[in-house]
Amino acid sequence: MKIGILCYPTFGGSGVVATELGKSLSEKGNIVHFISYAQPARLNLISDNLFYHEVSVKNYPLFDFPPYETSLTSKLVEIVKFEKLDLIHVHYAIPHASAAILAKEILKTMGVHIPVITTLHGTDITLVGKDPSCKPVINHSINLSDKVSAVSKSLKDDTKKIFDIKNK
């Protein structure tokens, strides 16, 4: 199976979980593509079935903040098409799940159908998720993901309390 993993590249929990999962999947014969703005800290070996794709963000004078989520979405569309990925697995709701859902919608217009799995890690729900500027996007991304997992039962319960989850 060809799997794209979107994650933060840092030593924080979600980046470590995503990287170790991807490494384990590659050891079992799957082809894994990590997609992020920097190589994940725990990804110290690239092999025949383990790849890293950097998301570069251009600075435009028009924007006060570089449009990372847009660049991430475009990069994901490119990789899904070129590498013929079977699955997208995202770790952390913002910006990874929202970028993957938009990429999925773009790819659908090109005749490419790809499932998105979202793994929730904690602060994406309990901290960022409560912020009114992020909550609708996270809610939408969770509801449009094909499968959703949480790193603990308490996080699953918090997610159900904070968001309007449909059929999950």
Q: What kind of feature is each model-predicted range?
A:
Residues 13-24, 133:
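Conserved alpha-helical elements of sugar-nucleotide-dependent glycosyltransferases
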Residues 61-88, 97-98, 102, 132-136, ...:
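An amphipathic, basic-hydrophobic alpha-helix
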Residues 40, 95-96, 154-156:
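Alpha-helix capping/helix-boundary segments
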Residues 1-4:
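Extreme N-terminal starter segment of soluble prokaryotic enzymes
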Residues 7-11, 23-68:
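N-terminal strand-loop element at the rim of the active site
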Residues 106, 114-131, 147:
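A short, histidine- and acid-enriched strand-loop-helix "catalytic/donor-clamping" loop
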Residues 144-168:
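A short, active-site helix/loop in glycosyltransferases that binds the activated sugar's phosphate group
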